[in-house]
Amino acid sequence: MDDLKLVWGDKDLFRLAWLKTNSTFYWSARPAGSAGRFDPVSGRFCGGSIVQHDPAGEVLFLHRNARKLRQGHVEKHWTHIEQFKVGVDLSEYTMSSVIGAPDFPDLRNCYGEDKNYTYYDLTPIEDFPFAVIEDRLIMYFNAGLSFK
C-alpha cells in the first residue's frame, strides 16, 4: 500500500480497517498539523510530531512520533506548530518529508511544509495555552527514569 501511495502510515491503515468493518469513528475536519523547530535564518520549519485537532479545529493532541524521548536524548523540539489554514481548500493540503540538513543537521527527516507557508500558519509554541507541555513531558520522562 505504501508503494501505491494509498496510505500515509498507520493512521490511514486504522481508517481503512474501520471502513472495512463498518466501525464508527470520527475524522477531524481539520487536517493534522506538525510540531517542531523553526529556523529564523533559513525560514525553514522541521516538524517531528503530529498535531491532531478536536471537532472545533483546536489542538487536541501532540504525538511525538519522529522525535522519541530516550535516555540521553531529551532535547526540546517544539518551538512552533504548523497548521493548515482554516478556510483554505483541502486540495491545497500536503504533508511532505524532507531532509533536515543543512539547517537541522541533527534531524534526519522533517515533516510538514518546510518553507512555503501560503496555506499554513506557523505559530510559536508560546502562543498556545499548553506552551509548557514539552517541559512537563521531559520532566515526567526524567522522573520515570528513576524507577529503574
Q: Where do the protein language model's features map onto the residues?
A:
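Glycosyltransferase catalytic domains, chiefly GT-A lineage
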Residues: 1-148
